[in-house]
Amino acid sequence: MPVTVCSVLTNCKFNSRGRVINIIQPLFLLWWGKMKDIVSDEKEIHMKVLVVGVSGRVGEELVKQLVADGREVVAGTRHTDQDFGAGVTVKNIDLLADEATLIGELRPLAVDAIYFVAGSRGKNLLQIDAFGAVKLENAAEALGIKRFIMLSSWNATSPAEWGEGLRDYNIAKFFADRWLMDNTKLDYTILQPGSLVEEPATGLVALDPTEPGKNAIPNVAAVLAALLQAENTYRRVITMHDGDVAIPDALRELKSI
């Protein structure tokens, strides 16, 4: 038996009867390795996130996905009578307010990350889609909330690629995206999907494609949720559309920048 035990453990010593008397250190190391995995899992499960834009199609799906992933979710909205079920706290976040007010609304929430998925659907592009995003980015930085995930639109940061149909919308998104990239030190990820469609989730996507394509809304939400702790996506812009690669694999396969 001592030979069998010491074939897998190091630093074993034997007494005169051939019994192991010094396996405490290796056993401790094995135990500690397991404990670190558990602590890491707990940190992931209990990460607290704010989603701004929960009334939209992507926002609703994102909240569901984050809750399913075990996140503690704060739904930021001016419509605080909404009910998202267990695991979600609804708090007032007014993107039309000034920056100081936003900081005051954010501070007591004590979140670890912020998602910006808000949009005015063309009704208030400057105040919501552009300046609302910028104020939230600045508020996050002022409070030391480093992780910021932005839902943008296809090639919003590349004006030469824009068509005429959504030019005003793209201008607003360009302003919000470039401010995040150029004027903050946040650990941001900007996700730029192509057209959104009301189709069921497939869990299969293409990340960083060169041509636009359709995106099932639940797929976009699932990618956003998966980005949360994907450090290889920090400080980068990622395009996407539906594809044939499972989301976890697609994230792992992203080329280094």
Model feature map: region roles:
Residues 81-142, 229:
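NAD(P)H-binding glycine-rich loop region in Rossmannoid oxidoreductase-like domains
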Residues 27-46:
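Short, Lys/Arg-enriched N-terminal segments with co-localized hydrophobic residues
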Residues 75-82, 195:
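Short, polar loop motifs at secondary-structure junctions
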Residues 58-62, 136, 176, 224:
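Hydrophobic residues within alpha-helices
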Residues 49-69:
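N-terminal Rossmann NAD(P)H-binding glycine-rich loop of SDR-like oxidoreductase domains
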Residues 72, 79-80, 120-183, 189:
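Conserved Rossmann-fold NAD(P)-dependent oxidoreductase catalytic core, especially the SDR/UDP-sugar
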Residues 198-257:
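Active-site-lining helix/loop region of Rossmann-like oxidoreductase modules
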